[in-house]
Curated annotation (Swiss-Prot):
Gene3D superfamilies cross-referenced by the UniProt entry: YVTN repeat-like/Quinoprotein amine dehydrogenase (2.130.10.10)
Quaternary structure annotation from Swiss-Prot or TrEMBL: Interacts with GRID2 and may also interact with GRID1. Interacts with EML3. Binds unpolymerized tubulins via its WD repeat region.
Record GO terms (molecular function): ionotropic glutamate receptor binding; microtubule binding; tubulin binding
Protein family membership: Belongs to the WD repeat EMAP family.
Free-text comment about domains: Contains a tandem atypical propeller in EMLs (TAPE) domain. The N-terminal beta-propeller is formed by canonical WD repeats; in contrast, the second beta-propeller contains one blade that is formed by discontinuous parts of the polypeptide chain.
Listed name of the protein: Echinoderm microtubule-associated protein-like 2
Summary of the function given for this chain in its UniProt record: Tubulin binding protein that inhibits microtubule nucleation and growth, resulting in shorter microtubules.
Protein keywords: Cytoplasm, Cytoskeleton, Microtubule, Repeat, WD repeat
Tissue expression notes: Widely expressed in both brain and peripheral tissues, including brainstem and enrichment in the postsynaptic density, PSD.
Segments annotated as WD repeats: 56-93, 97-144, 151-192, 195-234, 241-280, 285-323, 369-406, 410-447, 452-489, 495-535, 564-602, 609-648
Length: 649
C-alpha cells in the first residue's frame, strides 16, 4: 500500500493531533476516534495480520422448495441431497451429519442424480462479481463421495439460469440434458464426460419446468411447463419434437411434473389437479384421473414396486395410487409446512417430501410426516445468539421466529408473529428475547415458553436493532425514523418502561453497540454517521475524550476505529451489512452484499485489512453473530433464506 506523507492513504487520513482516522464512503468523511493506548504507535502502514483461525461450513439450515422442483433425492449412502443458496447439501439423517458441495458461485436452481447414484449434476443462475463482472450460468457435474468437481458444462452457452437438468437413464447415463431461462428456453443435450454439446433446440417461449430422459429409450426426452408437453426424439444429432395432444381434454395452464411407469407409460400432473397417462411412445392421452388433487399436482414419484405417488399443492395431500389409478391411501401434510413441492422415495415405505415453504419432511402415507429440515420462506435479517446456551434465534420477512439449537440443528421452538421481523436481541439473562418488526412494533418473548411477554410500538418505521445493555438494565430500540428509543428494564427483561428517545441522527439507525459498563452506547446510521449517547439521559455525547477510551461490549457497528479495515477499496457504504466480534476479542466476521463472509483479526484498524473469504450464500449476507462460546459463527442470507453455521477452527 502506498502512503502519501505521514498517515494518508488514498481513502484514509490519520491525524495524530485529533487522535482520529478519517475514511471516506461515497465521498463523505467518516471520522473515527483512536483509543489513547493505541494512538502513540498507530500507523496506517502497519500490515494487517490474517487470522490464524479459519471458518468451515458446519451446517446449512434451509431448503429451496419455494420456486424449484425435483430437487430432493436419497442416495445409497443414506444421505439426502438437496440445495439452498449456492450450497448442495448431503444430509445423513441417521448420523445427523451434513457434507457440502461448494463449487457454485451463485444460486443453484436444479439438481439431477446419475443412474450410478454417485454422480450429481447441479445448474446455477448467472451471477455478478463484486467488481460487476458477469458470472455465467453453467452446470457442474460432481462426485457425491469425494465432493470433487468432475466437469463444468456450458460456460458462455446458457442464458440467465439453468432451470432443468437430467441425466439419461439408459446407455450408462452418458448424456445430460439442460434447459436455460433464455427467452427461447433452449433445450441442450451434452456428452457430459467430454464436456461437449451434442445438439440444442429452442424449446418454448413459455416457462419450462421439467426436462427428463425416458428411462428405457435413450433417444426420447420429455419437457413440460406452461401450457405444453413435448416429446423429443434425438436422432442423428438432431432433436425433433412432437407436441402432446390434449384433444378432448382441457389443456392445463401448466404441466407441472412427469414420471414414468414400469410399462413405459408417461404420467403427468398439472395445475388443474389432473393426472394424464400418455401411452408408451405416443403423444396422446390414454387414461386420465380428473381431480386427483384439489389444486395443482406438484409432484409425481414412481416407487420401486411400481406404485405411483402424487403430491398436491393447494390440498397438501400425498396420495398413493393403485395400478388401476384408484386411491389406495392418502395423508395431508400439516398446513404450517405448506404445499408439497417434491416427493422422493426413502428406505422401506418412507418418503421424503420437500415443500414450497422450504421444509423437508420424512414419513409415510401410513404414518404421516414429521419435520426434518425447517427453512425460512422469505428474506431473512434478524439474528441473535443466546448469551449462555448453544442456541440462536432467526426471524424474517415471513413473520416467523425460530429459536434453534446449534447442536441438534432443529428448532427448539417456532412461532409466528403479526408483522415481518427485522431484528432480534437477547436479555443478558437469556430468559427474554426482543424482536423488532418492520412496522415499528417490537415484542418481548419468553425464551423458554415462546410466550408473548409484551408488545410495544415506537414510530411506524422498521426497527433495525433491538439491544439490551450488558447489565440488563436498559433496552435500546433503533428505528428507521432516525431515533433510538431507550427503555429501563426490570424483572429480568420482563418489564420495560420508556425512558426517552435519542434524537440527532439525520438518517435511519443501522447498528448499535453498548459500552461494557452500560453507561453509554454508540450508533451508526444510513448516512455513515457515528454518534454516542448517554443511556441515563438519552443525550448525545459530543466530547470525543469522553468516549474515546470506552470499552465496547460488542462490535456490531460497521463504522468505527476497531473495524474500519473491513471496508474494501472503493466501497459503497451499503456493501457491508453486518459485523460481529468474537467474545474473546480476537476475531471479526463481516457479511457483505456479494454473498461473502469475511474473517478478520480484531482489532481491524488497518485500511483494507486481510481476510479469509467464504462463499455459500448466494444473495446479500444480511447478518452475522458468534455463538456464546465462539465455537461457531452464524450468518443469514437475505433472499436465499438460509442460515449457515460455520465452525471456527
Amino acid at each position: 500500500m502506498s502512503s502519501f506523507g505521514t498517515g494518508k492513504t488514498k481513502e484514509v487520513i490519520f491525524s495524530m493531533e485529533e487522535g482520529s482516522v478519517k475514511m471516506f464512503l461515497r465521498g463523505r468523511p467518516v471520522p473515527m476516534l483512536i483509543p489513547d493506548e493505541l494512538a502513540p504507535t498507530y500507523s496506517l502502514d502497519t500490515r494487517s495480520e490474517l487470522p490464524s483461525s479459519r471458518l468451515k461450513l458446519d451446517w446449512v439450515y434451509g431448503y429451496r422448495g419455494r420456486d424449484c422442483r425435483a430437487n430432493l433425492y436419497l442416495l445409497p449412502t443414506g444421505e439426502v441431497v438437496y440445495f439452498v443458496a449456492s450450497v448442495a447439501v448431503l444430509y445423513s439423517v441417521e448420523e445427523q451429519r451434513q457434507r457440502h458441495y461448494l463449487g457454485h458461485n451463485d444460486d443453484i436452481k436444479c439438481l439431477a442424480v446419475h443412474p450410478d447414484m454417485v454422480t450429481i449434476a447441479t445448474g446455477q443462475v448467472a451471477g455478478t462479481t463484486k467488481e460487476g463482472k458477469p458470472l455465467p450460468p453453467h452446470v457442474r457435474v460432481w462426485d457425491s463421495v469425494s465432493l470433487s468437481t468432475l466437469h463444468v458444462l456450458g460456460l458462455g452457452v446458457f442464458d440467465r439460469a439453468v432451470c432443468c437438468v437430467a441425466f439419461s437413464k439408459s446407455n450408462g447415463g452418458n448424456l445430460l440434458c439442460a434447459v436455460d431461462e433464455s427467452n427461447d428456453h433452449v433445450l441442450s443435450v451434452w456428452d457430459w464426460a467430454k464436456e461437449s454439446k451434442v445438439v440444442d433446440s429452442k424449446c418454448s417461449n413459455e416457462a419450462v419446468l421439467v426436462a427428463t430422459f425416458h428411462p428405457t429409450d435413450p433417444n426420447l426426452l420429455i419437457t413440460c411447463g406452461k401450457s405444453h408437453i413435448y416429446f423429443w426424439s434425438l436422432e442423428g444429432g438432431n432433436l425433433s419434437k412432437r407436441q402432446g395432444l390434449f384433444e378432448k381434454h382441457e389443456k392445463p395452464k401448466y404441466v407441472l411434473c412427469v414420471t414414468f411407469l414400469e410399462g413405459g407409460d408417461v404420467v403427468t400432473g398439472d395445475s388443474g389437479g389432473n393426472l394424464y397417462v400418455w401411452g408408451k411412445g405416443g403423444n396422446r392421452i390414454t387414461q386420465e384421473v380428473l381431480g386427483a388433487h384439489d389444486g395443482g399436482v406438484f409432484a409425481l414419484c414412481a416407487l420401486r414396486d411400481g406404485t405411483l405417488v402424487s403430491g398436491g399443492g393447494r390440498d397438501r395431500r400425498v396420495v398413493l395410487w393403485g395400478s388401476d389409478y384408484s386411491k389406495v391411501q392418502e395423508v395431508e401434510v400439516p398446513e404450517d409446512f405448506g404445499p408439497v413441492r417434491t416427493v422422493a422415495e426413502g428406505r422401506g415405505d418412507t418418503l421424503y417430501v420437500g415443500t414450497t415453504r422450504n421444509s423437508i419432511l420424512l414419513g409415510s402415507v401410513h404414518t404421516g410426516f414429521s419435520l426434518l429440515v425447517q427453512g425460512h420462506v422469505e428474506e431473512l435479517w434478524g439474528l441473535a445468539t443466546h448469551p449462555s446456551r448453544a442456541q440462536f434465534v432467526s426471524c424474517g420477512q415471513d413473520k416467523l421466529v425460530h429459536l434453534w439449537s446449534s447442536e441438534t440443528h432443529q428448532p427448539v421452538w417456532s412461532r409466528s408473529i403479526e408483522d415481518p421481523a427485522r431484528s432480534a436481541g437477547f436479555h443478558p439473562s437469556g430468559s427474554v428475547l426482543a424482536v423488532g418488526t418492520v412496522t415499528g412494533r417490537w415484542l418481548l418473548l419468553d425464551t423458554d415458553t415462546r410466550d408473548l411477554v409484551a408488545i410495544h410500538t415506537d414510530g411506524n418505521e422498521q426497527i433495525s436493532v433491538v439491544s439490551f445493555s450488558p447489565d440488563g438494565a436498559y433496552l435500546a430500540v433503533g428505528s428507521h425514523d432516525n431515533l433510538v428509543y431507550v427503555y429501563t428494564v426490570d424483572q429480568g427483561g420482563r418489564k420495560v418502561s420508556r425512558l426517552g428517545k435519542c434524537s440527532g441522527h439525520s438518517s435511519f439507525i443501522t447498528h448499535l453497540d453498548w459500552a461494557q459498563d452500560s453507561t453509554c452506547f454508540v450508533t451508526n446510521s444510513g448516512d455513515y454517521e457515528i454518534l454516542y449517547w448517554d443511556a441515563a439521559t438519552c443525550k448525545q455525547i459530543t466530547s470525543a475524550d469522553t468516549v474515546r477510551n470506552v470499552q465496547w461490549a460488542t462490535a456490531t457497528c460497521v463504522l468505527g476505529f476497531g473495524v474500519f479495515g473491513i471496508w474494501p477499496e472503493g466501497a459503497d457504504g451499503t456493501d457491508i451489512n453486518a459485523v460481529a466480534r468474537s467474545h474473546d476479542g480476537n476475531l471479526l466476521v463481516s457479511a457483505d452484499d456479494f454473498g461473502k463472509v469475511h474473517l478478520f483479526s480484531y482489532p481491524c484498524c488497518q485500511p483494507r485489512a486481510l481476510s479469509h473469504k467464504y462463499g455459500g450464500h448466494s444473495s446479500h449476507v444480511t447478518n452475522v453473530a458468534f455463538l456464546w462460546d465462539d465455537s461457531m459463527v452464524l450468518t443469514t442470507g437475505g433472499k436465499d433464506t438460509s442460515v449457515l453455521q460455520w465452525r471456527v477452527a
